[in-house]
Every structure is written in C-alpha cells, then in structure tokens.
Amino acid sequence: MSDILNTILARKADEVAERSARVPLAELIARSADLPLTRGFAAAMQASIAAGDPAVIAEVKKASPSKGVIRPDFQPADIAVSYEFGGATCLSVLTDVDFFQGSDAYLRQARDACTLPVLRKDFTVDPYQVYEARVLGADCILLIVSALEDAQLADLSGLAMQLGLDVLVEVHDIDELERAVQVPVPLIGINNRNLRTFEVTLQTTLDMRSAVPRDRVLVTESGIVTQADVQRMRSHDVNAFLVGETFMRAAEPGESLRQLFFAHD
C-alpha cells in the first residue's frame, strides 16, 4: 500500500470517529430506512454498453493530492448539467475533504441538478460510511481493494447491496483483481494510475482485461485523454470509462466529454 494511501486511510478512520460522534450510527440507520429508490448506477452502465455506446462515468473533482487544484471555478450543479447534456451515463463526485477538497454538499448539489446516477467517490472503510452514502443520496460507492481486507470487502459490499447501492470495486494489479472477482458485484474498475508512483499507463487495463469475467462491466479509470485512447480501449472491448481531470480542465466539461466520446470524423 502506498504512503499516500496509508495517510488517507489513517485520516479516514479519524474522520469516521468524528462524524459518528456528531451523528450516531443509529441515527443514520434510521434515516436510511424509508428513502426513495436509488437511480440504478450499474443498470445505467449496462444499458449504455448494450446500446453500443461508451458508458462514461464523468467525474466532478475540484482537486487531487498529486495535481492540487484542478478547477478553481468549481460549480458542481453546473458541471452535472453540462455532463448530462454531453452524454455522460453516470457521475462520480469526490466527497473526501482533506485530500481532494471534496464535500458531501457537492454530491447533493450535483445529483439534484441532473437525473444521472451518482457514485460517491471516497475511501470507504467502515459501515458508517455506507449508511452515510445512502443518506446523502449516492447511488453507488467505491471500494478500493488495496485499502481493504477480504472480510471488509465482503461486509461493505453486502451492506451496500442491502441498502440498494451499487458498488464499484477498484483494483490496480492482478492480485487485487483476483480478490475483487470474489465480490458479487457487476462493476470492476481498473485504475491505470499507480498509487505508489502516480504514473499512468493504459496498458494496465489492457494487461488485465482478459482476467475480468465476461459478466462484469470493466471500467477503465485514469489516463483517458484523446479519442485515440478511447478507440484503443474500445477495440479491446473495454467500453466503460471513468474520466475526471481531462474534463475538469475544459471550459465546458460536457462539451469536452462529447468531443472525446461522441464526436465522429
């Protein structure tokens, strides 16, 4: 596990303790009881692919530990509207405060502004956060295999499904993938960014794609910048993408999405 990930996870444990002191778990559980149905994140991804289209998870991200502030003029609702207009299948919203300058409020603002399913992009390590995600209005959570033991993966994914949330299980290498496929969820993300060096190579996805079961949706994450990158992935039957920084640096994120995925020469 990388030093930065260790640092984030240590902080996340403290954050869960702080939040549960303010809003007890019992209160979150009660609030999660009679919520509206989620929007169906995995189903939306599968429907896009079945229609022959790329399934794009468009990320709403202000900053990152490696790049600092990516989008100074950060308006989550406007970004969400732009993404929906540009053809996104789903959204990913960063809610980590300390390392990504995210916010729970950003998720609410983005989701309220559109009809797309939304992933809560955070470092989920505790059942408290799963209930919290459901109460916030998320439709999907992220589980990072390198941050969790097998028992945690099973427990957190099981709880998420019980609450009606989809789960994106993220891996970076073949050992993590072997663990991920034991989790009975349809979405497996391959992060092309090495969290130890922050180097990005699309070859990571291509080297591992054949080991992903055919009944799962493989989502390639990080490093998709050009139409050639998209074509390279789709030529290898990789049809689901999570893209953030490329869009966040554009004046109109949704137009950037449309140009990257849907503009044909």
Swiss-Prot record:
EC number(s) per entry: 4.1.1.48
Catalytic activity: 1-(2-carboxyphenylamino)-1-deoxy-D-ribulose 5-phosphate + H(+) = (1S,2R)-1-C-(indol-3-yl)glycerol 3-phosphate + CO2 + H2O
Superkingdom, natural source: Bacteria
Single GO BP term: L-tryptophan biosynthetic process
Entry annotated with the keyword rRNA processing: no
GO molecular function: indole-3-glycerol-phosphate synthase activity; phosphoribosylanthranilate isomerase activity
UniProt entry keywords in alphabetical sequence: Amino-acid biosynthesis, Aromatic amino acid biosynthesis, Decarboxylase, Lyase, Tryptophan biosynthesis
Gene3D superfamilies, A to Z: Aldolase class I
Disulfide bond sites: none
Family that this chain belongs to: Belongs to the TrpC family.
PANTHER family: INDOLE-3-GLYCEROL-PHOSPHATE SYNTHASE (PTHR22854:SF2), TRYPTOPHAN BIOSYNTHESIS PROTEIN (PTHR22854)
Annotated protein name in UniProt: Indole-3-glycerol phosphate synthase
Upper classification of the organism: Bacteria, Pseudomonadati, Pseudomonadota, Gammaproteobacteria, Lysobacterales
Gene name of the record: trpC
